[in-house]
Amino acid sequence: MTSKIAIVGAGPSGCFMAQSLGKACPDVEITIIEKLPVPYGLVRYGVAPDHQGTKAVIRQFARLFEKQGVNFAGNVNVGAGDAADLSLAELRDIFDVVVLATGLSEDRRLGLAGEQTGGVYGSGAVTRFWNDHPSDQALAPEFGNQVVVVGNGNVALDVVRLLAKGADDFNGSDFDPARVVTSVTDIHIVGRSPAHGAKFDAVMVKELAKIGSLDVRLDAPLCDIQEDKRLQALQDTVAAAAPNTAKTVLTFHFGWVPEALDIAHNCVRSITFRSQDGAMKTLPCDSVVTAIGFDDSRREFVGDGDGVIERGLYCAGWFKRGPRGTIPENRHDTQKVAQRIANDIADGIAKGHAKPGIAALKDRFGESIVTYDDWLAIDCTEINAAAVGRCRGKLKTVGDILKAV
C-alpha cells in the first residue's frame, strides 16, 4: 500500500521537504498543496527581485514535478474559516501524512504607538509588493524623500538597495519598471546592535558599493574593524562614495533602539531612537520601513525537535522553528523531518484502509486545481510579458494568473 503524503506550502521548505521525502521514503505519493495558483512561495515573492541568482533554486525545485513524480495542487487553501477550501481535518482524512510548511509572513512590529499609521511599512509586505504578490497589491507604499529603515540585517540592506537603485540597475531582474522608486533622496538605516553585532553580510554591503548614484555615510566612526570583513566592506564603501554624483545619501546608525513615532495628520513625520547610555536621536522622515523579522506568535501548532506535532502531522521550515535560517538551511531541517516520517511510515503509521490522496483532491475540486502543467502555461505567459530589460512580467492578481491557465 502506497502511503499518501501532503505537504502544505510550495515554498522552499515545502519543496525541500518533498526532495528529502523522495530520498528517505521513495515509494510514496507526494502532493504539494499551495493556496496560490503558483508554486515557490518565498523564492518567488520574498527574495529581492534583483537577486535572480537566489531565485534560480526554482530550477532545482522544478525537477520535483518534472522528473520525480511530485504532484502540484495550487489554488487550494487549507485552513480554517470561510476563506478555506479544505480544513486540516479533511486533509488528514485523505492523506496518511500531512506536513505543514507554510512559513511565516506577518512582519514583527516595533511595538510603538502609531505604528499602524500610513507611511510605516513592514519589509515583508513591501518586498511582496515589489515582487507582485497578489495579496499585497493594495499596499502601494509611498516612501517620499526621506526614509528610515529599522534593522541591520540582510533584509534591511535589501530594502535600502531597492530604494536606492535606478531603473537601469534592475536590468535582468523581474522588478516591474513602474515600481522603481525615484523619490528617495535620504535613507537612514538604524540598528539596535552596535556595529560588531550587525547581522548583515559583507557581500550585501559590497552590492551597495556598485550603486553609482548612492553616497554611503556613517553616523559615527567604526572602531576595531580589522577582524570583521563586514565592517571592512562598509568602511571601504564609505571611502569610495562619490557624493558629487549621488542621487541618494545613505547613513548607517548603530546602537539605537526605536523609542517613539511622531505622527501628524495620520502620517509619520519622524522617529526617535534611544542609545544604551540614554541619549536620544530624532530622524525626520516621510516613511519608515521595519526590517526586524517576522512574527511567529500566531503559529497554531508547535512541533517537537523532529517536527512532530502528533502522529501523522508534522511541520517544517519556519513554521516549525520560527523565522530563522536561510533558504539553504531549510534543506538540512527538512532532511531530519523526512527521516522521522520515513521511520514512522516503517512503523505502520499508514496501516489500515488506503487513503486516496491526490485523487480525492481532484474529485473534490476538479479543474479549479492548478496543476504543474498549468503553472508552466502561467510561467510562459509571464516570460513573454517581460518588459525591456526584464526577465519576466509577473501577473499580479489571482484572477489574471488563472486566466493564463
Where are the regions that the model predicts?
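Rossmann-like nucleotide/phosphate-binding core characteristic of flavoprotein oxidoreductases
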Residues: 1-8, 12, 16-31, 46-50, ...
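Short acidic, glycine/serine/threonine-rich loops at helix termini
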Residues: 43-45, 87, 109-113, 159-162, ...
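Dinucleotide-binding/catalytic capping subdomain of oxidoreductase cores
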Residues: 157-275, 345-353
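Glycine-rich FAD pyrophosphate-binding loop
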Residues: 26-41, 180, 192
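Short, conserved catalytic or adaptor-binding loops enriched in Gly and charged residues
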Residues: 60-67, 113-115, 179-181, 237-249, ...
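Conserved Rossmann-like nucleotide-cofactor binding loop
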Residues: 13, 38, 105, 155, ...
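Glycine-rich dinucleotide-binding loop and its adjacent helix/turn
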Residues: 107-181, 302-307
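Conserved N-terminal/central alpha/beta ligand/cofactor-binding core
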Residues: 38-39, 43-97, 106, 115, ...
